[in-house]
Amino acid sequence: MAVVLDLLNNDTRPKVEAPARPRHPEKAHRPDTAIQRKPDWIRVKAPGSKLWAETKDIVRANNLVTVCEEAGCPNIGECWEKRHATFMIMGDTCTRACAFCNVRTGLPESLDAAEPEKVADAVAKLGLHHVVVTSVDRDDLKDGGAEHFSRTIAAIRRASPGTTVEILTPDFLRKPGALEVVVAAKPDVFNHNLETVPGKYVTVRPGARYFHSVRLLQRVKELDPTIFTKSGIMVGLGEERNEVVQLMDDLRSAEVDFLTIGQYLQPTRKHHEVVRFVPPDEFKAYETTAYAKGFLLVSATPLTRSSHHAGEDFARLKAARLAKLGPAPVAVNA
């Protein structure tokens, strides 16, 4: 063994770099699908302003991950120009393999114990009045990352007491007690996306369970009715209108306050194809239907994303609840 190591150490042959690990190894076997040309109503301005660069520098300096970059969000230029960024905690590698998502998949690294403080520091430096924190799925962790969420919320509260906190969580499937840990940290908004209608889960979101996600949102309200709840879906995946309307009913039965609906955009040829681009007038019709069903707030446009305009939407949420329901209810320990 020593001889082999000596030979390797003295080897002067040119080093051959190992091939980069594919971003989505589980999708390698999938046939390529054509990426359709986007219609005019989905075009966005390319990022590159001074404020955008400043936001990027703060994110890099704190060695943070943002879902804006990892998911290829089309609104990154607009949001970062306003110094808004959605922080993605617990690494850049997800343990799920959803057919729509551009986030890297595989076996994640260990948690960074300093990450909550790094996020809090970036929030303070950016001067955020409202921050959105999301994460990859961490099925490898006993609590799914619930304690890490809790610590991040607490760190932000310490560093920026006036900042409201919105979280976008995974489903904590088969992680008993995890949700209770996160809710106890008292985020101002608890967001968990259904992503699509139940009939599409097998092909679009195979690692999740639709009614588990609905129940998760319902349980948040049972644990603390003062927390706003929010969920979002993508359209253009082949769903029917009646399926979307039924999904609205399911969310209202769980007392969800805020619904977002946006156009699905295909990240690569290996991802789920865009079945169609839904025109703006159909988004408007979805918005009208959702408001009629009792949602406090609805955002339904082709470029709507969960965190887009989150700060402004939080102010609108508070105003809508006050106008419709009166002062916020008092939390009851469950």
Swiss-Prot record:
Residues in Radical SAM core domain copies: 80-296
Biased composition annotated in UniProt, kind: Basic and acidic residues: 12-33
Highest taxon in the source lineage: Bacteria
Cofactor: [4Fe-4S] cluster
EC number: 2.8.1.8
Catalytic activity: [[Fe-S] cluster scaffold protein carrying a second [4Fe-4S](2+) cluster] + N(6)-octanoyl-L-lysyl-[protein] + 2 oxidized [2Fe-2S]-[ferredoxin] + 2 S-adenosyl-L-methionine + 4 H(+) = [[Fe-S] cluster scaffold protein] + N(6)-[(R)-dihydrolipoyl]-L-lysyl-[protein] + 4 Fe(3+) + 2 hydrogen sulfide + 2 5'-deoxyadenosine + 2 L-methionine + 2 reduced [2Fe-2S]-[ferredoxin]
Cofactor binding mode and count: Binds 2 [4Fe-4S] clusters per subunit. One cluster is coordinated with 3 cysteines and an exchangeable S-adenosyl-L-methionine.
Pathway per the UniProt entry: Protein modification; protein lipoylation via endogenous pathway; protein N(6)-(lipoyl)lysine from octanoyl-[acyl-carrier-protein]: step 2/2
Keywords: 4Fe-4S, Cytoplasm, Iron, Iron-sulfur, Metal-binding, S-adenosyl-L-methionine, Transferase
Gene Ontology, cellular component aspect: cytoplasm
GO molecular function: 4 iron, 4 sulfur cluster binding; lipoate synthase activity; metal ion binding
Residues binding [4Fe-4S] cluster 1, per UniProt: 68, 73, 79, 307
Main localization, broad class: cytoplasm
Region (Disordered): 8-33
UniProt cross-references to Pfam families, sorted A to Z: LIAS_N (PF16881), Radical_SAM (PF04055)
InterPro entries: Aldolase_TIM, Elp3/MiaA/NifB-like_rSAM, LIAS_N, Lipoyl_synth, rSAM
Residue numbers binding [4Fe-4S] cluster 2: 94, 98, 101
Cellular compartment(s): Cytoplasm
Family indicated by similarity: Belongs to the radical SAM superfamily. Lipoyl synthase family.
Protein name listed in UniProt: Lipoyl synthase
Annotated organism of origin: Methylorubrum populi (strain ATCC BAA-705 / NCIMB 13946 / BJ001)
